Amino acid sequence: MFFARLASGPIHNINSFQKQLVNLPIKLTEENITVGIQRILLGSIKKFVVAERLAVDVNQYFDHPFDILSSCDVLFACIFYTVELYFDFSGYIDIAVGSAKLFGIQLSENFNMPLRAKSISEWWRRWHITLINWFTQYIYYPIAYRFKSKRNLAIVFSIGGTFLVSAVWHGLGLTYLFWGLIHVFYLIVEAFSKKNLAAIEQKLKPRLYAALFIPITILLVSFSNIFFRASSMTDAFGIIHKLFDWNHFWPPLSFKDWLIHGEGGSLKDLFNFRLAAFVAILYLIYEEKCLKIVNDVKYSIFRIVFMLLILIILGVFDSAGNFIYMEF
């Protein structure tokens, strides 16, 4: 097994991947080394500057006694867990892709800016792309073909079968099964609402449509991730109960105090969270440009030094955990 390509992805067809390995040994080139190092540093910043800092607050909220949390606390925890998961997993992929690039081996991209998705189906076309392609080829299409004469049944069973396997892929617990069932529900509703959604998209300007449906998609994914993150069904339903407890929506502080001082926690934790949130939002705004820059050789020495300084100064290494998707 090539060391940069682990079970968490990117997942390749053996025939296409083997063609690259046939040409070994690889000649090291300035471009491959430069782009590879930049990609590794980008992935390390995602993991150790953003994901690890977000994890401190996210873990605190998910592992906190739910009866003292407000709905706003739970809402932010769910959203930022989704952000943490993305930066953690895409950071791992960046490191894997960059490590392979050092030796001239091209691994497939596994993400295409999923937090810009305007629907759940688009989310899954942008998230863990190599795994979804594998599921589509070997599970979705065969089931859909089996029911090709009955379109509605084909949609229901192909989506249901795909996400049943996906749930088992991640774990055998009920929480993963419910996570999969929620996405089955999302995708079936979307599939049967295509005409209505297309009509809405035609009436709205593209930017307005994106401004409306990107947040909706993130909220829907974040809700499903309650089951993905919770350690038990009891915890998951406890979080959901607090999420919809409208009598305690805001924290027991004024919004200004809550925004500045937070609710409990040390000053170090509050700084970690705000710094991580700022870097995450900044990156997501300029994500497309950042990905182009790290694949550019021009002025690379300045970018490498800059990213290395960010990693050394702001990285969290002493309490860093494993990459989340290494657990699956």
Residue ranges of model-derived segments:
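Substrate/cofactor-recognition hotspot
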Residues: 286
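Membrane-embedded transmembrane alpha-helical bundles that form the catalytic cores
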Residues: 1-281, 290-327
